[in-house]
Regions:
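A short beta-loop-alpha structural element at the N-terminal edge
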Residues: 1-15, 23-28
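Conserved GNAT-fold acetyl-CoA-binding loop/helix
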Residues: 22-45, 56, 90-93
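A short helix-loop-beta-strand connector motif used in the catalytic cores of GNAT acetyltransferases and
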Residues: 45-59, 76-80, 112
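Conserved beta-strand in the GNAT
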Residues: 59, 65-74, 112, 117
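Conserved acyl-donor/pantetheine-binding loop and adjacent beta-alpha core of acyl/acetyltransferases
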Residues: 74-111, 115
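Conserved catalytic-core motifs of GNAT/GCN5-like acyltransferases
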Residues: 75-77, 145-148, 160, 165-167
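Conserved GNAT acetyl-CoA-binding A-motif
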Residues: 109-111, 132, 138-149
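Conserved acetyl-CoA-binding loop-helix of GNAT-fold acetyltransferases
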Residues: 115-120, 124-137, 157-161
Length: 167
């Protein structure tokens, strides 16, 4: 079942989103322990209007677990959301690293899909596809964009099948 995220989903979503940051090899993930990062992500989902704020998230629930999620928002607010990271209770070493995603990727006239992630336990079941289709079909009047690692052939194929174009 696909539904909007709630604050109580924060622990499961944080663990999933951490997988993306780890794959992206972000500086903050290299320098700060997994436990501390997941704790901050949990807080960002509930306490501040960061990219990962729960109102920007839809989850795929299966067996009473968050099997996957998609994070999307108005692209014109991307950097405003990013600055909210600094409103978290950051320790000095984390503050010195800076915000996790300081470069603007979204265009102001687009709605930006920040992330689509499926739990390793549920991969290969079409969850990412269903999340993307749900988002696009329930918000068909929006112009959607996303970024993808060009080496991620499986994701690129999925995005192309759903009508996304390489720019």
């Amino acid at each position: 079942m696909i539904r909007k995220a709630t604050p109580s989903d924060n622990k499961q979503i944080a663990k999933l989103y951490y997988l993306i940051w780890k794959d992206m090899e972000l500086d903050i993930v290299k320098e700060i322990s997994k436990k501390r990062m997941i704790n901050l992500l949990e807080l960002s989902i509930v306490n501040v209007h960061y990219r990962t704020y729960y109102k920007n998230i839809w989850v795929y629930e299966k067996n009473n677990e968050v099997a996957g999620c998609i994070i999307a928002y108005d692209g014109s607010k991307e950097m405003e959301y990013e600055e909210q990271w600094n409103q978290l209770p950051l320790e000095e070493d984390i503050r010195l690293v800076g915000t996790p995603l300081p470069i603007k990727e979204a265009k102001n006239d687009e709605w930006y899909i920040e992330a689509v992630v499926t739990s390793p336990d549920y991969r290969g079941q079409g969850i990412a596809t269903q999340l993307l289709e749900h988002l696009i079909t329930t918000s068909f009047n929006k112009k959607w964009s996303l970024n993808c690692d060009y080496n991620n052939e499986k994701a690129l194929k999925l995005y192309k099948q759903l009508g996304f174009k390489w720019v």
